[in-house]
């Protein structure tokens, strides 16, 4: 299962992952697998352009963050390529993942 979370931003994610982790510790034996790790394996996050992309990369890994411009909507960036300045501190490989490769691999058909 692969899920892309778009049009939601990512500011809520730290709280969600913390709550999932707390639930695991409060209900030992209820989960066959760690729900935090399952979330990280199966969900790709598209932050709003004003969200902290570096925090999101720390939470999910660069391989599960996807770029989306929301252009031409008013809440989107007027020039989507300006987002490159928002990810300038990522290394080249991670920047390429976020800006292109993750979405590409997420939307490519998978073998049956």
Residue ranges: model-predicted function:
Residues 69:
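Single, functionally critical "micro-switch" positions that shape active/binding sites
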């Amino acid at each position: 299962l692969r899920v892309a979370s778009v049009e939601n931003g990512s500011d809520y994610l730290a709280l969600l992952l913390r709550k999932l982790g707390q639930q695991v510790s409060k209900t030992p034996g209820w989960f066959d697998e760690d729900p935090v790790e399952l979330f990280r394996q199966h969900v790709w996050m598209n932050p709003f352009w004003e969200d902290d992309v570096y925090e999101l990369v720390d939470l999910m890994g660069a391989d599960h963050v996807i770029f989306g411009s929301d252009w031409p909507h008013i809440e989107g960036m007027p020039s989507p390529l300006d987002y490159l300045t928002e990810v300038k501190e990522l290394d080249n490989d991670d920047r390429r993942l976020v800006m292109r490769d993750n979405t590409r691999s997420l939307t490519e058909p998978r073998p049956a």
